[in-house]
Amino acid sequence: MSIKEILSNDLKNNYPDGQFTLEQYAAGLEDAIQNGMKIIRSGDALLIYKDISKGVAEAHVINGGVSIIKGINYLFKALMQLREDGYKEVQIPYDKKEFAGILSKLPIFQVTTEKLDGGQGRTYLTKVRLA
């Protein structure tokens, strides 16, 4: 799957109301990368992340619409890469409550989730301990 297809599928699954076009979504991703965010591709998923403190990153998952099992596997591989790079914790904000259940299935990592009131994209926060 191409990056454009990953973005298109994520857009359909997570923003079905048409609030963003594919071009706007891709431009937002490009801007984020130009402003210091980093990207890891794992299969048909992208993990976009930035440092928020020493050894801690904030990450956002862009999923190409794969099955939950494949998605967990892709996310696990990306998190293992961050662990190898020296990160101790990854914080993942999101809106869909179901995502907490997916994250809780990550093998070997300690995962805690809390409800926030931080606006769009920040209803929940899951912290994944990598070390």
Q: What is the role of each PLM region?
A:
Residues 67-84:
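Conserved acetyl-CoA-binding loop-helix of GNAT-fold acetyltransferases
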Residues 42-47, 57, 123:
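Glycine-rich phosphate/pyrophosphate-binding loop shared by adenosine-nucleotide-utilizing enzymes
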